[in-house]
C-alpha cells in the first residue's frame, strides 16, 4: 500500500463534520508539563500530503512500535528520522524475547544526541520517518504514546485532566453557555459524587459453584477496602517469576491532597475501581474480580503503561488456556480512553488494537467506556468496536469483538454526557449510579452546619466527602462499562448451566465460541 493511498480518504474538515462530531477541550498546560506531554494541534502540526489530523495528547519523548516483522525496519527509519533532528532513539523497552506469549510492543525513547540542544517531539520524528519510508512501502505499526484518561463524571476536571476523564461542561456551563444540562450530572443530587445510605443486603454468592467462576479483570485504579469486596477479589496474583500485576504503587490518599492543588479534596479518581467493583458485584455476585491497577489517582493513564498491563493480562489468560495454574480471564473492563489524531487510520498504526485483538483471540471479551464528552468523535479503545466506516468494520472471525458502552439515565434514555456514534455499540445504566466507596475516605470538606443537641447527640448537615458509610453516587460511562461487563459474565454463566458450568480448562476455540455467544446475546452487530 502506498503512503498516498493511506491518506487518500482524509478525515473530514471541521466545517463539514456531522452534527455532534466535536473536539473536546484539551488538558491545560499544567497537566501536560506534569507528564512531559504535548498537545497535537492540527493548525500547527506537520502533516503529509492528503493527511488531516485532529487534536490529541501524547508523551513528547516516547514512541510505540508493534512487535511484528516490520519492527527492525521501523526502528531503523525512526532512528534515521531522530538523527535528522539531533536526537537519539533508545529502546526503553524492547520487544519481549523468547517463546512466552506476549502482546507487548516496544517503547522507544527520544533524547538529545550528544551535547546539542534539540526539540524533543515524537510527532515530528514519526512524520519524518513516514517520509523516509516513501510511498511504496509505508511505515507500519508505529504510533504515539498517548495520554489517556479515565471516564466518570467528576466535578473538577481541571484537577484531573479535562476533558478526557470528564469534559468541562460537567463542572461549569462552558461550552454550552449559561446553565448546562450536562453540568448537573456532577452536582450532588443530580448524579454527582456524594455519600448515600442504602438498606439493601450484601449480594449473595453461590457457594459452592457449579463449574468455575467467571473472572472480570478491572483495569483501573487500586481497589480499596469495603465489606462487600472482601471475598471474590483476586489479590496477590503474580506471573511466573513473581511479576506483580499492574501498578499497585498508584495508591490514592484517603484524606485528600494526593494529587492536585492543596485544597483538602479527595483525589478525583481515588475511589474509581472500588465503585466499579461494587457495580460488578451487584450485577453478577458469582463472578470474581481481578484488580489490575494502572490509573493514577488523578485519572491519568499513559498508553505504554496500559499496554504493559494488557500484556500481563494476556499472559495470565494464555497460561490458563494451556492448563497452567492461575486465574482464567473471561472479561476485561476498561473505563478509560483517548482521542486518536487520525481515527480513520488508527488500526494501521495502533499497538493497542493489536493487543486487544490478541485478547479476543483467547476468548476474552473486552468492554470499554464510550467517553463523557457528549460527542460522536470516536474515543479509543471503545471505537474499536465493529462499525461501518470505522477501523474495524466487522467482528473478527476468530476473536471476541470489542464492545464500546455508552451510558443511560435511570429512565432508560441516553445520558446527556455520554459519547455515542462509533464509540457505543451497547448501552448500560451509567447515570446516578449507587455503589461501594472506600470506608476509610474522609477528606477536607466539612458539614456546612454541625452542633451537639440538648440530648448530647451530634447533628450535621450532609458531609459530602465522608464515605465511612461505604456507599456513594456517581455518573459516567466509566460505570456503564463494568455494568455491561458484568452482564457478559452473567451470560457466560447462563449459557454454561446446561453443560455443568464454566469448565476449569478448555480449548481456546471453545473459549472464543463462548465469548462470542455471550457478547452476541447482548449486542446486535
Regions found by a protein language model. Name each.
Residues 3-24, 29-59, 63-76, 80-191, ...:
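Autoinhibitory propeptides
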Residues 138-140, 212-215, 285-288, 327-331, ...:
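Loop/turn elements at helix/coil->beta-strand transitions in domains of secreted/extracellular proteins
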Residues 145, 293, 333-337, 367-370, ...:
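A cross-family glycoside hydrolase active-site/sugar-binding cleft signature
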Residues 148-150, 222-225, 296-298, 337-341, ...:
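Solvent-exposed loop/turn segments at secondary-structure junctions
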Residues 161-170, 175, 179-184, 188-287, ...:
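Active-site core segment of subtilase-fold serine proteases
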Residues 220, 243, 385-493:
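Extracellular S/T/G-rich loop segment that most often corresponds to the catalytic His/Ser-adjacent loop
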Residues 295-396, 465-482, 517-519:
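Substrate-binding/access-modulating region of protease and related hydrolase catalytic domains
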Residues 323-337, 398-402, 493-525:
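C-terminal subdomain of the subtilisin-like protease fold in secreted/lumenal serine endopeptidases
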Amino acid at each position: 500500500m502506498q503512503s498516498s493511498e493511506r491518506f487518500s480518504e482524509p478525515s473530514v474538515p471541521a466545517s463539514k463534520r456531522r452534527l455532534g462530531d466535536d473536539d473536546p477541550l484539551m488538558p491545560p498546560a499544567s497537566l501536560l508539563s506534569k507528564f512531559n506531554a504535548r498537545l497535537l494541534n492540527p493548525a500547527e502540526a506537520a502533516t503529509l500530503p492528503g493527511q488531516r489530523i485532529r487534536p490529541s495528547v501524547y508523551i513528547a519523548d516516547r514512541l510505540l512500535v508493534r512487535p511484528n516483522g516490520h519492527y527492525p525496519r521501523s526502528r531503523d527509519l525512526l532512528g534515521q528520522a531522530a538523527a535528522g533532528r539531533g536526537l537519539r532513539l533508545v529502546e526503553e523497552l524492547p520487544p519481549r524475547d523468547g517463546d512466552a506469549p506476549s502482546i507487548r510492543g516496544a517503547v522507544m525513547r527520544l533524547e538529545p544526541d550528544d551535547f546539542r540542544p534539540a526539540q524533543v517531539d515524537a510527532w515530528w520524528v514519526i512524520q519524518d520517518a513516514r517520509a523516509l519510508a516513501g510511498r511504496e512501502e509505508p511505515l507500519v505499526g508505529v504510533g504515539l504514546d498517548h495520554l489517556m484518561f479515565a471516564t466518570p463524571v467528576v466535578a473538577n476536571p481541571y484537577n484531573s485532566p479535562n476533558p478526557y476523564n470528564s469534559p468541562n461542561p460537567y463542572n461549569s456551563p462552558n461550552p454550552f453557555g449559561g446553565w448546562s444540562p450536562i453540568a448537573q450530572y456532577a452536582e450532588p443530587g443530580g448524579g454527582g459524587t456524594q455519600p448515600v445510605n442504602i438498606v439493601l443486603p450484601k449480594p449473595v454468592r453461590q457457594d459452592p459453584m457449579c463449574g468455575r467462576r467467571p473472572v472480570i479483570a478491572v483495569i483501573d485504579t487500586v481497589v480499596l477496602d469495603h465489606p462487600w469486596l472482601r471475598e471474590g477479589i483476586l489479590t496477590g496474583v503474580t506471573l511466573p517469576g513473581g511479576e506483580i500485576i499492574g501498578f499497585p504503587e498508584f495508591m490514592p490518599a484517603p484524606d485528600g491532597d494526593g494529587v492536585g492543588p492543596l485544597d483538602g479534596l479527595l483525589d478525583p479518581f481515588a475511589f474509581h475501581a472500588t465503585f466499579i467493583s461494587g457495580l460488578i458485584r451487584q450485577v453478577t455476585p458469582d463472578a470474581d474480580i481481578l484488580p489490575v491497577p494502572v490509573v493514577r489517582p488523578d485519572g491519568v493513564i499513559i498508553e505504554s503503561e496500559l499496554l504493559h498491563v494488557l500484556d500481563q493480562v494476556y499472559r495470565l489468560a494464555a497460561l490458563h488456556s494451556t492448563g497452567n495454574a492461575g486465574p482464567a480471564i473471561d472479561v476485561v473492563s476498561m473505563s478509560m480512553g483517548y482521542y486518536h489524531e487520525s481515527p480513520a487510520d488508527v488500526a494501521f498504526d495502533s499497538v493497542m488494537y493489536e493487543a486487544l485483538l490478541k485478547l479476543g483471540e483467547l476468548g476474552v471479551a473486552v468492554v470499554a467506556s464510550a467517553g463523557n464528552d457528549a460527542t460522536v468523535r470516536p474515543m479509543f479503545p471503545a471505537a474499536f468496536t465493529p462499525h461501518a466506516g470505522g477501523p474495524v468494520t466487522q467482528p473478527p472471525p476468530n476473536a471476541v469483538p470489542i464492545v464500546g458502552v455508552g451510558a443511560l439515565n435511570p429512565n432508560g434514555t441516553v445520558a446527556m454526557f455520554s459519547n455515542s456514534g462509533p464509540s457505543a455499540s451497547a448501552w448500560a445504566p451509567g447515570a446516578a449510579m449507587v455503589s461501594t466507596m472506600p470506608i476509610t475516605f474522609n477528606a477536607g470538606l466539612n458539614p456546612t452546619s454541625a452542633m451537639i443537641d440538648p440530648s448530647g447527640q451530634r447533628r450535621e448537615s450532609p458531609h459530602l466527602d465522608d464515605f465511612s458509610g461505604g456507599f456513594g453516587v456517581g455518573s459516567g460511562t466509566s460505570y456503564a462499562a463494568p455494568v455491561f461487563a458484568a452482564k457478559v459474565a452473567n451470560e457466560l454463566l447462563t449459557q454454561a448451566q446446561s453443560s455443568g458450568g464454566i469448565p476449569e480448562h478448555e480449548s481456546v476455540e471453545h473459549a472464543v465460541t463462548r465469548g462470542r455467544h455471550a457478547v452476541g446475546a447482548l449486542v446486535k452487530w
